[in-house]
Amino acid sequence: EDCKPLEVNNDTRWKAGVFNKDKPQEDEDSDEVITKKALLILNKLSLTKFDKLSDDFIATGIGKNEKILHDIIWTIVGKAQDEPHFAAMYASLCLKLSQTPLELEADAPKKGKKFKKLLLERCQQEFETNTAEKIADATKDVEDEEEKAYQAGLVKKHYIGHMRFIGELYRADLITIKIMLFCLPALLEGETTF
């Protein structure tokens, strides 16, 4: 049989969103668009481009409402856990965000408190989760011992990354000595360790 090339159907083929004129454009101020823009900038963030990109990150409007702020905080904490060598950079970004007045705090007497409160709640929630249980959850459906060890290693890496991020938040004065004094005995007793 003779093979002929596939025919291109311009009506149904995939087109990049930028070039797709038929697709209705999303509202620039929608939560989804703001979150996407912020995540794109966050993925480009590095120590050399920190000043410019952190300003761009704040300018996206992440302080418009609590849902966007919540999603962004979860992402920042997750990235700090995955990339512990950049924990200081993410802590600096958090410091800059806490010092920036957010739109949702327009009527609040103290600016920056909402971000800091949500960040500390997320860090506390992550700190208080039992790492042994997280390892058990991650490896319960895995049969291969090598894969189990890999999954357990990932959970431990996240845990260590989170501890480093907490330390960097303390160095940036976002966490008080009182909180650190609460964390240290828990770490030294071995209750939350693996």
Predicted regions and their residues:
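Alpha-helical interaction scaffolds
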Residues: 1-194
